[in-house]
C-alpha cells in the first residue's frame, strides 16, 4: 500500500488472471485457450496490415470489423460495439449501464471479474447462489436490482441457460439492462443475439479469444439496441478512442468472416469434450454437463488441490479455485485429443498411487 493511492485503489481486490507459464513443454489446460491455431485468413490479414500504415492511428469506429460482425450475426452496424477484449467491453457496460441505486445481480459462482468491476465503479453487488446442481435458477433474479450480468454458458461450471430462460429474465426485468456474456457460447449453447431486436434491455457480449483462437489479439464486442451501444461509445470516447489497433481490426474481421473454420474447429473441441467427460467419469469424477470448451470436475475421494499439484509435477496445468463451494473442483480446458489422453492417463496413475 502507498499513501499516494486513492481510496478506491485501497479498497480494490483485483482480478487474478490464469497463470501464463513461460515454459513451453507444458500441457496447458488452465485458461481455456484454443488448442488450435487461429484461422489462416486472420494470420494473413495481420501480416498484410503490418505495413507503413502503422504510423497512422487506427480507425476509431472499427468500421471494417463491425461490418464483418454485422454480416455474421445479421444485425445493424449501429447495434455493434467493439473493444480491446470482452473484458474491456464488460467494463464499459458496467460503467455505462449498471450504476444504479439497487444492487447488481450476478451468480455467486461465476467469472470473478464481475465483482472487481463492481468494486472499481462503486456498484452494489448481490451474488445470487447457484442451486445445488450448480445451475442458475432464473426465478431467483425476479427482484429489484440495478441489472443482471449472466455468463452463458456459465464459467467455471460450463452449464448453459436456454433461450426460453433468458427471455423469461428479460421479461421479468424490462426496465433494467440484462448483460449476457457469451464468451463460450460457440461450443454448444444458443446465442441470445436473435432476442436483441425484441428486447431493448439486452446486451450480448462476445469474445474472439476462445472459439476464434485469438486470445493474444484481445478483441471483444457487444450487440444490443443502438441506445445501449451509444452509451458504451460515450464511455469509450471518454477513456480511449482507439481501443483496437490496425492489426487487431484486420485479423478479427478475417476471423469472423471464416464461418467454415469456426464450425470445423468448435466441432472438434465439442467432440473431444464429450470424450474427456466420459474418460473422467470412468475415473470416478463427477463432471458437470458442459457446453463450453472446458469441463468442471471433482473426485469424491481426492482433494482437488492435491490433484492439481500432482498434475503440475507431470507438466500438466489445470485451474483450481480456492473459492468457497468450488474448492474441491477442477476446471480443465479441452485440449487436443492427445493432450486429454495424457491428462487422463496421468490422473489414472495419480489415483492408483493414492489408493495404495
UniProtKB/Swiss-Prot annotation:
Pathway: Amino-acid biosynthesis; L-histidine biosynthesis; L-histidine from 5-phospho-alpha-D-ribose 1-diphosphate: step 7/9. It catalyses: L-histidinol phosphate + 2-oxoglutarate = 3-(imidazol-4-yl)-2-oxopropyl phosphate + L-glutamate. This is Histidinol-phosphate aminotransferase. It comes from the Bacteria. Its cofactor is pyridoxal 5'-phosphate. InterPro entries: Aminotransferase_I/II_large, HisP_aminotrans, HistidinolP_aminotransfase, PyrdxlP-dep_Trfase, PyrdxlP-dep_Trfase_major, PyrdxlP-dep_Trfase_small. One of its GO terms (biological process) is L-histidine biosynthetic process. Belongs to the class-II pyridoxal-phosphate-dependent aminotransferase family. Histidinol-phosphate aminotransferase subfamily. It is an enzyme of class 2 (transferase). NCBIfam families: hisC. Keywords: Amino-acid biosynthesis, Aminotransferase, Histidine biosynthesis, Pyridoxal phosphate, Transferase. Signal peptide: none annotated. HAMAP family: HisC_aminotrans_2.
Amino acid at each position: 500500500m502507498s499513501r499516494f493511492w486513492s481510496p478506491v485503489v485501497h479498497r480494490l481486490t483485483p482480478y487474478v488472471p490464469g497463470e501464463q507459464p513461460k515454459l513451453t513443454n507444458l500441457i496447458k489446460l488452465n485458461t481455456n485457450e484454443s488448442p488450435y491455431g487461429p484461422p489462416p485468413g486472420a494470420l494473413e490479414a495481420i501480416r498484410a496490415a503490418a505495413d507503413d500504415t502503422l504510423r497512422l492511428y487506427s480507425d476509431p469506429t472499427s468500421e471494417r470489423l463491425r461490418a464483418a460482425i454485422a454480416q455474421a450475426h445479421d444485425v445493424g452496424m449501429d447495434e455493434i460495439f467493439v473493444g480491446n477484449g470482452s473484458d474491456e467491453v464488460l467494463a464499459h457496460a458496467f460503467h455505462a449501464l449498471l450504476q444504479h441505486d439497487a444492487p447488481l445481480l450476478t451468480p455467486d459462482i461465476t467469472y470473478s471479474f464481475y465483482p472487481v468491476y463492481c468494486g472499481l465503479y462503486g456498484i452494489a453487488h448481490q451474488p445470487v447462489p447457484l442451486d445445488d446442481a450448480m445451475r442458475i435458477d432464473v426465478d431467483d433474479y425476479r427482484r429489484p436490482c440495478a441489472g443482471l450480468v449472466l455468463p452463458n454458458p456459465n464459467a467455471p461450471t460450463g452449464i448453459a441457460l436456454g433461450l426460453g430462460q433468458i427471455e423469461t429474465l428479460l421479461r421479468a426485468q424490462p426496465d433494467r439492462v440484462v448483460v449476457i456474456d457469451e464468451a463460450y457460447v460457440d461450443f454448444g449453447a444458443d446465442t441470445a443475439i436473435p432476442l436483441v431486436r425484441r428486447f431493448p434491455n439486452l446486451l450480448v457480449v462476445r469474445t474472439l479469444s476462445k472459439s476464434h483462437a485469438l486470445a493474444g489479439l484481445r478483441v471483444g464486442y457487444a450487440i444490443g439496441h443502438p441506445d445501449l451501444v451509444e452509451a458504451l461509445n460515450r464511455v469509450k470516447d471518454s477513456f480511449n478512442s482507439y481501443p483496437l489497433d490496425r492489426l487487431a481490426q484486420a485479423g478479427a474481421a478475417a476471423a469472423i468472416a471464416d464461418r467454415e473454420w469456426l464450425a470445423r474447429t468448435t466441432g472438434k473441441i465439442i467432440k473431444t469434450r464429450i470424450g474427456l467427460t466420459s474418460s473422467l467419469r470412468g475415473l470416478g469424477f463427477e463432471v458437470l454437463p458442459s457446453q463450453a470448451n472446458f469441463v468442471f470436475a471433482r473426485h469424491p475421494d481426492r482433494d482437488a488441490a492435491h490433484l492439481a499439484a500432482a498434475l503440475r509435477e507431470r507438466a500438466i496445468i489445470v485451474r483450481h479455485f480456492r473459492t468457497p463451494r468450488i474448492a474441491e473442483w477442477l476446471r480443465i480446458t479441452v485440449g487436443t485429443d492427445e493432450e486429454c489422453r495424457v491428462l487422463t492417463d496421468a490422473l489414472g496413475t495419480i489415483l492408483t498411487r493414492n489408493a495404495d
